[in-house]
Amino acid sequence: MTPDLNRRGAFAEHFGARLRLPLIAAPMFQVSGPDLVIAACRAGVIGAFPTANCRSVAQFDEWVSKIGAALGPADAPFCPNLIMRRESLREELAVLLRHRVEIVITSVGAPDPV
């Protein structure tokens, strides 16, 4: 069951034990990749990357798989940054759902599809 994180304090209750600091690290265009995200999560902060750093949906799927496989249940969650104006948005959303990604950032457009 997916937790309702809209309730005040719910985010901290759900993720707090896995975070050393309440921050998101590394969502940098053409810089952030799986290794940086994994390191951030293992250090206790949310590791992020823009989906635009992946050159294809297949590569995005590979990155999400690699990150998910590298992290344990006590590590901080990772957080792809979905670029809302990308042609591959629907396919990227399908990857996120298939891998049950816990957190998503949206940018460059309205987040309504998410």
Regions found by a protein language model. Name each.
Residues 1-114:
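Active-site entrance/lid segments in N-terminal catalytic domains of soluble metabolic enzymes
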